[in-house]
Amino acid sequence: MNLSFDVITKEGDKIVVSLNSFYPYISELIGNTFPQLEIVEITIVRESGEKPIKMEVFGRIAQVLISIAQDNPDTILYYFCDMTEGLPHQRSGRTLSCQEYRNNLFKHLFQRYSSESTEHWTDIEIEMRSTQLEQTLYAHFLLRDKHLPLVDILRNEVLNNFKSISDQK
């Protein structure tokens, strides 16, 4: 899957949401068990605008993503919470890292909008502690119940990939 859509806010900000096949390969075990499976990475990029993006905009994005996933029954959505600065991350009097802010936002949005879906979805959160970056990084897989047997494999692939990248630095 390779598609994207633009979201233009009332304030004129432009956000581009892309969905692209995440792994050009899927581990042999996953491929043998679920030959039609596609893991799709979600990328959200703000192309213009400087004011904080309202929750209703993120809500619209989440609704579209859930709709796309529902239309593609052999799809697992993947999201890595990036470290781009520029977002407000104050919550209850404490400062959150960009990663933690995005992690909480992603969890909240998909819990809310996946509950409106006709299917049951599970959000698998993966925490990766980086001593080099001195912070915790987060990734998520959003998957259907039929894909739950893959959780450990997916988690291990992300953690092993993260470890190999961390070891190179």
Segments predicted by a language model, with ranges:
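Non-catalytic substrate-recognition and accessory regions of acyl/acetyltransferase enzymes
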Residues: 1-169
